[in-house]
């Protein structure tokens, strides 16, 4: 499988970012984001932790840099969601959706609902679409799309 070629790199990046226990989740995220294909394997070109490439879709041309940035950004999302353990699945879901939306979902959902649901993720997506004038905003079902690939270790 294309994602598994990056397993050791994901494990190292997660260790460096202080989120070693989440490396298998990151592999599932990579499967959802790119199936391990292309160069921006974690689709994080637009992420604020990307300082080496343009902040436009698929601008990252080094898969290992994409993994590094993705791990740093996911560590930030986990912190925003208050998720300190892989076993805290409710907070993990918030962190995953925050990674996909890229901005402020964790804070918003914790203030308004306290937990992730597809319904409140859809509400947030529509709110951001309207605010930004975009035709779509993220994937409100990202959590389920990632977790179908996740195998707890």
Model-found features: residue ranges?
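Generic recognition of cysteine residues
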Residues: 14, 44-47, 77, 83
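Glycine- and aromatic-rich loop/turn segments at beta-sheet edges
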Residues: 38-47, 117-118
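Short, functionally critical alpha-helical segments immediately adjacent to catalytic or ligand/cofactor-binding
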Residues: 20-37, 44, 67-71, 95-101, ...
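N-terminal carbohydrate-binding/catalytic regions of secreted carbohydrate-active enzymes
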Residues: 4-20, 24-25, 29
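Non-catalytic cell-wall polysaccharide-engagement segments
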Residues: 1-3, 9, 51-68, 72, ...
């Amino acid at each position: 499988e294309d994602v598994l070629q990056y397993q050791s790199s994901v494990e190292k990046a997660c260790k460096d970012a202080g989120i070693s226990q989440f490396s298998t989740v990151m592999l599932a995220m990579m499967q959802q984001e790119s199936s391990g294909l292309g160069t921006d394997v974690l689709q994080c070109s637009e992420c604020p932790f990307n300082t080496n490439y343009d902040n436009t879709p698929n601008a990252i041309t080094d898969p290992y840099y994409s993994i590094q940035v993705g791990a740093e950004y996911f560590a930030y999302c986990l912190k925003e969601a208050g998720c300190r353990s892989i076993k805290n699945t409710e907070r993990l879901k918030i962190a995953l959706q925050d990674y996909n939306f890229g901005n402020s979902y964790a804070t918003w959902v914790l203030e308004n609902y306290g937990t992730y649901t597809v319904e409140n993720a859809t509400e947030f997506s529509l709110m951001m679409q309207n605010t930004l004038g975009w035709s779509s905003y993220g994937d409100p079902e990202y959590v389920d799309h990632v977790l179908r690939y996740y195998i707890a270790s």
